[in-house]
Amino acid sequence: MQARLQAIADGVDGTFGLVVADLAGQHRFEVNADRQFTQASCIKTPILLEVLKQAHDGKLQLADRRWVEKQDKTGGSGILAELGDRTVELSIDDLCVLMIVMSDNTATNMLIDQIGMENVTATMASLGCEQTVLRRRMMDTAAAARGEENLSTPADAARILRLLHEGTFVNREVSNHALSILRKLKSGAIRSTVPQSVSVAFKPGELPGLLTEWALVELPERPYIVVVMGTYNPRSSTDDDLDAAMKQVGKEAYKFFKGRK
């Protein structure tokens, strides 16, 4: 299995990192697991966790409502930027759902402003995920031009997903709330390699030259994690090439774990 995954990574004209980890046994396979990658929308998972942690700590209420103001709106993915100014009032929990399911950048920035960028990074460090850092809001082109990117590693992402599966991010209730939102997504490279009857809690991300995906595949009796992060050379490759490599990893993982007990 390790050799097959390494061959997939070696076939990418760029940099490719992955973790495939067994949650019911000891199997774990890695390639570039400790390498930092820009996360694109996958950084929204740590943001979600910080929101839920602060709700548990009494710093905010998930039922609290926020108007979507003109100054909140930002471009890129999502729907809130297309709506009228101050015509929509949403709960913090609803903003979380929009951030994950629609990857809504306006909802994401509203949540970052609510919880504090530095708190996301601090919480990740407290979990042993020191390489996972939130350094800018969504669509902040000036910060991006300065090289301030939101980062993580395959190993950190796998650790975060394991904590959610085990119910040890804050507690079982908070972990389950996060998973319930992450399960709402329908389309992703790893998701596509698993039968629809199998639940997958996941978040994909995409930027020019970059694809990422964090996935917890809840295969009955044999749950497992697949994290893939990759960049490619746009002069010789495309999104489709990297997406195909990610799907190969997902197929290998499903084939490996299916039927194991």
Sequence positions of predicted segments:
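Active-site SXXK
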Residues: 26, 38-66, 226
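Soluble periplasmic/extracytoplasmic beta-strand elements of cell-envelope proteins
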Residues: 17-21, 30, 46, 67, ...
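Beta-lactamase-like hydrolase cores
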Residues: 1-35
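Mid-domain, small-residue-enriched loop/turn segments at the edges of structured enzyme/sensor domains
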Residues: 15, 88, 109-161, 165-166
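Conserved catalytic neighborhood of penicillin-recognizing serine enzymes
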Residues: 73-109, 117
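Acidic helix-start/capping segments at beta-turn-to-alpha-helix junctions
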Residues: 23, 62-78, 115-116, 181
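Active-site-proximal beta-strand/loop segments in catalytic clefts of secreted hydrolases
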Residues: 21-23, 70-71, 100-103, 114-115, ...
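Structured C-terminal helix/loop/strand segments within mature extracytoplasmic catalytic/sensor domains
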Residues: 1-8, 28, 114-116, 159-188, ...
